[in-house]
Amino acid sequence: MKVLQINMTDMFSTGNIMLNIAKKARERGHEAYTASKKTRMSMCQNRKDPYHSYIGTRTEHTIHRYFSWMTDLQDFGSVIATYELIHKIKKIEPDIIHLHDIVGWYVNIGILFNFLKIYNKPVLWTFHDCWAFTGRCIYFDSVKCDRWKTGCGKCPQIGYMPKSWYFDLSAFNWKRRKKLFTSIENLTIISPSKWLKELSDESFLSKYKCVVINNGINLEAFKPTRGGIYDELKKLNKKIVLGVASTWSKRKGLEDFIKL
């Protein structure tokens, strides 16, 4: 089986998830390809992987990003990059296309999803945030907004990534995404948590099956141990709350941890 995964990055959390899935798929005898946006850190890493390809150029990404910031017409850029990606898809002829994060100013979702509709092969889409069913936001819980259920508009997070400098076209973007994303017949959504699944089930994507597959953990590295710091912590005879984040913010509960 041939599988192609597409993600915003080949690094960090979602990038590593994509690459680890590809690695496991190859170990089981499948042809696993990956594609991602080429970032500055990707260039420094200089990945030499015959199964990986980069989408677009740094110049295209920059133009796309500034166009989005100035107009709030998200994901209308990267036309050439998206057609080049489609050419690669046709060349690989994958049996399954697995999407991850497609926000990030590197693909034109209109061109991509119109192609996926015609290509008519199974599409998996792993949600790593809420962007797919909103008009802009990747998260909305910190501002307690539920406009994503009815069509967005009057966005309270216009300055939050992916931001807009001047306009609020979140209602237009919401309608456009609904039309594009619900046009795919054979689509299965994957959520890493029950919480995100429940949100997806309340959105315009509720007609699609959403399966919870938790992010994997390397049990060789993360496992119960005795001795060392365990013994020191046990001596304290206190309840310990552990939280981990790549970068802490109010939305990720930093203030709650401080209160605890």
What are these regions (language model features)?
Residues 1-47, 92, 118-122, 185, ...:
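N-terminal subdomain of nucleotide-sugar transferases
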Residues 12, 219, 248-253:
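A short, basic/aromatic alpha-helical/loop segment that forms part
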Residues 26-96:
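A conserved catalytic-core segment of Leloir-type glycosyltransferases
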Residues 87, 118, 131, 147-189, ...:
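Membrane-proximal helix-turn-helix segments that form the acceptor-binding/catalytic region
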Residues 87-107, 121-128:
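Short N-terminal targeting/anchoring amphipathic segment
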Residues 190, 232-252, 258:
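Conserved donor-binding/catalytic core segment of Leloir-type glycosyltransferases
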Residues 195, 216:
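Carbohydrate-associated surface elements
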Residues 201, 217-232:
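Acidic anion/phosphate-binding donor-loop and adjacent secondary structure
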